[in-house]
Amino acid sequence: MAAKKKTKKATKKTAKKAVKKSTKKTSKKAVKKTAKKNSKKVSKTTVTLGGNKVSVSGKLPKVGSRLPKFALTTGTLSEIGNADIKGKRVIFNIFPSIDTPTCATSTRTFNEIASGLTNTDVYCVSADLPFAQGRFCGSEGLANVKTASSFRTNFGAALGVNLTSGVLKGVLARAVVVVDANGKVLHTELVSEIANEPNYSAAINALK
């Protein structure tokens, strides 16, 4: 009788262990499967800087979608957002820093382009302080573009253009976003090599 009880107890214990082990194994598998699934969902966006891969925080808004809610700081240190650009077509010329040759060239080129556009504002956007942006445009005599800084706003995160790795981590990638007077995205370009200039023609054609 005692032996029978002992056997029953041992069987119960073994069964318990087996269930526990099986549950643990299944749980581990489920966690692993979920992690794998999630890693597939989040595909990293990358560009290059001098041929070296660097990560970008997200993806540009889709053509046809509404421009995400954003904020930028102007030369007077006031903030602007979606409501401030409503009613005008806008080209956002986005880049790392006004103090680099390619960024300076793109600002000059878009200044020239802006002179021939109607009902269109061209914003040159970087993480530079507004004073640096204003100083550059003032010394170069660039009066057709507007400058705006992302240094204390959500702009980079909202549009998915923050550089998240590499030597320029923390500033913006090189990109162009064009929107119509109602805030609908007409064209986007994430320049694959930061040292290269954007496709100016594609930006202009999006407004035709």
Model-derived features with residue positions:
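Chalcogenol-based redox active-site neighborhoods
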Residues: A2-K4, K25-K208
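Primarily low-complexity, compositionally biased regions used by nucleic-acid-associated proteins
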Residues: M1-T11, A15, V19
